[in-house]
């Protein structure tokens, strides 16, 4: 019974963003107060590196890493800072899967989630080399 209560309480901390009308899908781990005046994520590069170190199966040996600076975009009807990222990561077997493009959404200057289907979020993004990502280790 205690395990079921713990699991239910942890599930309450995570919500499906589709349920919140954001329309982008994925899990959301931060409380979105819905304020329109979002602070700029000054340490976005550090946040992205920390996230990708745990997100990627093999964070070593990344190629072709590029990132755009955060800009304000409308995500699910709310203004958020979003930055776009391109990289070619290794699979577990050491092969490369090809360049992936992702959008990273920030709430209250903290990385909230990564969106795989970037659609309009990354349209017109100006990318610059992201050598720190190519130097990432496990």
Stretch-by-stretch model annotation:
Residues 9-12:
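C-terminal motif of bacterial Sec signal peptides marking the signal peptidase cleavage site
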């Amino acid at each position: 019974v205690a395990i079921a209560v713990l699991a239910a309480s942890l599930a309450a901390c995570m919500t499906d963003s589709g349920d919140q009308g954001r329309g982008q899908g994925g899990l959301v781990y931060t409380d979105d107060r819905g304020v329109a005046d979002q602070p700029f994520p000054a340490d976005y590069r550090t946040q992205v590196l920390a996230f990708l170190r745990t997100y990627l199966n093999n964070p070593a040996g990344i190629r072709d890493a590029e990132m755009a600076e955060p800009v304000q975009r409308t995500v699910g009807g709310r203004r958020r800072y979003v930055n776009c990222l391109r990289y070619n990561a290794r699979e577990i077997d050491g092969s490369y899967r090809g360049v992936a493009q992702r959008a990273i959404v920030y709430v209250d200057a903290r990385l909230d989630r990564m969106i795989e289907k970037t659609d309009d979020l990354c349209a017109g993004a100006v990318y610059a080399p992201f050598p720190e990502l190519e130097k990432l280790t496990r």
